[in-house]
Amino acid sequence: MTVTRSPRRMASPSLASVQSLPFSSQPASRSLYPDSFQLGEGYPTEEDFFVARQEDGKGLGVYTKRAFPRGYRICLISGMIVHEVMQHTLQIAGTSHLYDPYFTGYLLHSCDPNTFLDMQRFELWAVKDIAPGEALTMDYASTEDVLFKQFPCLCGSPNCRKWITGRREPARMPPVAE
């Protein structure tokens, strides 16, 4: 499935350029979700986050423009309810999944994440202090029974599991060439 995003989301602004703007010249906060979502306060905005390609050039991630202390509710999340596992979905319960190709679908995986998703309240929480410019990470096994696609983990944390799976599926690692 191909997901197209508006050009304003694909841009990869550097944190330095965002912080160097004088306050009076900064544009009003814009939601990272399309206008058709008509969301109120508490949802992710361009004032607090940006979506950009990872430093290694692989994949997109959500990065912060400001600090979030441990225990802070970072934001509310939104999306469409679907009944199949696909890229950018997060499992709510059973066969119900939240499809969010604008924000939560771009949270990066870490075996030692800095956020926690409360899928009952649709809230994202900081479980560690998060600095400006840092990628938001979650443990994909914390929400998913079965992943859309398993993959090797490169998070580098001391407790790295090396292979990312859902919490209820066996690892299907490719055979090692001899």
Regions found by a protein language model. Name each.
Residues 2-178:
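Conserved catalytic SET/PR domain of SAM-dependent protein methyltransferases, capturing the structural core
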